[in-house]
Every structure is written in structure tokens, then in C-alpha cells.
Amino acid sequence: MDTFQEEREHWLRSRLKFSGKTKLNSDGLDGSVGVAADSLVGQNDAIGFDYRDARSYGNDTDSSAASIRYRFPAWANQLRIEAGRSRYDHAVSDAGRRYNASGESRALAVSASRPLFSRFGIAFDGIARHQGRDSTFSEENSLVSESRYQFSSVGLEASGGHEFGAGLVANTRVLALSGREFHSTDYPSQDDTVDERGFYKVAFSASVEQELFQWNWRVNGRYQFADEDLPSSEYITVAGPSMLAGFNGQSVSVVSGGWLRLDTDSPAWSMPLMDGVLSRVNFAVLQGWIPYSGAREDRFGKASAGQVSLKLQGRTFTANVSVGRMIRASTTAMTTPDHPDVRFSMSMGI
């Protein structure tokens, strides 16, 4: 007679997620580790911690950063709090003199979103954010400057989707945002500086998805309008490695611009000689636009790249191999590499 024993998974195992990566070469090392958990303290909340440490022997630099974040519901609101601290040290050579320079930074950010109303299948949400950062810069253990940065914004987001016949699904999103940015620097030996300005931006995004001949086809894009006083944190990235392989580490972020991406996923199939491993292929093409601007007349133009990816999915691991190449670049912010961009990533369950 067979005997069956019930095994129950520990409640922490289903909630904790670990991540990490390490880059080690002759110049130095760069490593990071993170842990995240869902519904650990209360229902529908999320908490996470990240730490990064990097050292470069060639540049004689040493830096580290740590941050913790917590997202939780409060009545009809979704609140997110994030706090972090970072430091760096590096050697500076100036006019034959070599000395040590260092800096520290402390940051706190709070954001909230709230559903407002819904009309004609479109949901409207209110968004508010505030963040502050205090930094110090020193040379040879003597204070050079203290700076303070503050950023506040409020906005309205409208989003909606519709499923048409034959499996065609379309989604749209519009974000209108306005706010103020404040930056001040105190110098012990010279005049202080203060800079405060307002800004606005409007961003449109849309996607269309459909399954055809068992392949999943998607077209999605984003375009942004903004004034020239927009903080760099609100810039839109129109081309770069975070979007597609093929740009060989180059990235372009601008005040106003947009991008359009077409990609397709193959149906999954079993890998031969690899029991329980499924694989699929992805083809993608992306093009970014930078409109002409008198303030940045040397950056306008286009950049495009294509990518082929192979994904392997096993019971306890996921592996991705991507090969991309830039097709063309008419903006001076990028150059067309003479070799393809190859990436490999793997994640394993613990």
C-alpha cells in the first residue's frame, strides 16, 4: 500500500523573492543584492530592500548604496515610501596633486495614487509625489559644499482598454503632470546658489496586441510633450539598452520625444534532450524620435534597432539570450556600432 505524506510550504517561501548580480573583472567589481516580499506585513502590501557595492581599481573609486521601500493601501489610496543612503570615495588628480574626494547622500520619497472616477470605460486616477535629498561633498576630509534637492508634482492619469473581435486588445494611457523643482547649494567659502522652477509634461502611450497563427503580435509606443525646464528624472528615454538590445550601451533621454516598438513571440515548444524545459523566440524592432528643439538642436533625429531573443523556461530557472543590432541613427547623440550587441541573463529559484 502506498503512503502519502502531506507537505506544506513555509509561508515565507511563497512571499520572499531574492535577486542579485555580480560583475568582476581586472578593473574591479560591481555587485548588488535585493530581497522583496508581498503581503508580508498586511494584505496587498509590498516591501523591498536593495544594496549595491562597487569598486574600481583603475579609477580608484569606491561606492555603495542601500535603499528600502514599502508600498501599502490606505483606504482608497495606494501609498509608497522609499528611503535610501549612498556614499562614494574617489581619488582626484589635479595639477600634479592627488587627493581624496568623497560624498554622501540621504533621500526620502513619498508617493500616493487614488482612483477618482470612471467614465466610458476610462479610469481616472490622481497622482502626487514628493522627494527630498540632502548631499555633502568633501575634499581631503574638509567640507566643500552641502546641497538640498526637493521635487514635488501632482497629476492626472487616464487609462482604458478594449477587447475587440478576433482577440484584438487595445490599451491607452494619458498622463498630465505639473510640479516644482528646488535645488540649493551652500558653500562655506563662497556665495550660496538657489534654483527653483516649475514644469509640466503630457505623456501618451498606447498598445495593440493580437494572436495570429499562434504567434503573439504587439505594437506599443509612447510620446511625451514637455517644457524645457523639465527635471532630468522626468525625461523620456527614446532609445537605449533598457528598451532593446542593439544600442551597445548607448542611451538617449530627452524632454520631448517618443518611440514605437513592434515585437512578436513564438508559441512555446519543448527543448529536445532537456526534459521539462520550454523555449520561445522573440523578434523586436524599435525606433525612437527626437523632434527639433532650439534648445537642443544638435540632438534631434531618429534611432532604430532590431533584436532576436531566445528564452528558456525550466522548473527552477529562466535563461535569456538576446542578439541585437542598431539599424540606423540620424541623431548625433548616438553612433552606429560596427558589431552586434549580445546579452545573456539567468535567474534561478532558491
Spell out what each predicted region is:
Residues 9-16, 43-50, 86-94, 107, ...:
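Flexible, solvent-exposed coil segments and beta strand-coil junctions
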Residues 16-22, 31-33, 47-53, 81-87, ...:
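Transmembrane beta-barrel strands of outer-membrane/channel proteins
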Residues 10-12, 40-46, 75-80, 117-125, ...:
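Short loop/turn motifs that connect adjacent beta-strands in outer-membrane beta-barrel proteins
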Residues 24-28, 59-63, 74, 101-107, ...:
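Transmembrane beta-barrel outer-membrane domains
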